[in-house]
């Protein structure tokens, strides 16, 4: 989901909004979803008229009162605001979804509880990972399903990804691991078990005349990724 914060012309914003709604509807239709009435978008800044009587490919009726667990505004205003927009967009597609502000630790308890692994529909959380990309294995290998106590909360299960992940863990060289990591990313890019929203900007300050890092362009910053990378930072004489 992307949110257009600035637009130059009303007609451009209208076309963008309508186009996104129509694209979402076409994805549902192509996947075999049906509806008594597919609704319409009026083509202005108002909300779409959502579909009614929507059903899945096998006639499944979507659950009612689905919740998006997301941190409240007191913890993270960005994630809270995104959850409100996303819930509204999903409702415009004919699904009964509401954003529910929830404490961070409460969300963790809900979605990572093996006994409750199928008892929720949506959640939003932020996280950080280290430089070595083995987190992709922890998050998405089928053996790490949260129903078994792991971190794979979506229940993602793709044998092709599992095979590449196994090879990644067995890699003997950095170059081999990089190639396999890129393959994992390519598969995840297509399957999208997570929808990544944004990475907040990080401001880090260091003495460039005294120290030199082998790299500085890293998500979440050097402090989060490697605690400042003391093993590889060089001092200048």
Language-model features, listed with the residues they occupy:
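Detector for C-terminal structural segments
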Residues: 8, 13, 21-26, 77-88, ...
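Ligand/substrate-recognition segments at binding pockets and active sites
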Residues: 13-21, 31-129, 153, 202
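Positively charged, low-complexity/disordered segments
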Residues: 1-9
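Disulfide-bonded cysteine motifs in exported proteins
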Residues: 6, 48-51, 69-70, 142, ...
């Amino acid at each position: 989901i992307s949110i257009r914060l600035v637009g130059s012309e009303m007609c451009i914003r209208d076309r963008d909004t309508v186009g996104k709604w129509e694209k979402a509807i076409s994805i549902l239709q192509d996947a075999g979803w049906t509806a008594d009435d597919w609704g319409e978008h009026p083509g202005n800044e108002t909300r779409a008229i959502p579909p009614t009587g929507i059903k899945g490919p096998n006639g499944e009726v979507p659950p009612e009162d689905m919740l998006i667990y997301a941190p409240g505004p007191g913890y993270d205003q960005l994630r809270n605001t995104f959850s409100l927009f996303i819930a509204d967009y999903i409702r415009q597609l004919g699904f009964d979804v509401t954003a529910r502000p929830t404490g961070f630790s409460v969300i963790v308890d809900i979605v990572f509880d093996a006994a409750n692994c199928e008892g929720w529909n949506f959640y939003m959380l932020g996280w950080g990972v280290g430089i070595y990309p083995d987190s992709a294995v922890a998050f998405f290998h089928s053996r790490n399903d949260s129903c078994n106590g792991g971190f794979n909360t979506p229940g993602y299960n793709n044998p092709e990804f599992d095979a590449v992940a196994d090879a990644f863990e067995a890699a003997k060289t950095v170059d081999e691991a990089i190639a396999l990591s890129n393959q994992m990313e390519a598969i995840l890019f297509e399957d999208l078990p997570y929808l990544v929203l944004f990475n907040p900007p990080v401001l880090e300050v260091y003495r460039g005349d005294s120290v030199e890092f082998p790299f500085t362009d890293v998500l979440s910053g050097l402090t989060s990724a490697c605690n400042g990378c003391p093993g590889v930072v060089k001092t200048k004489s």
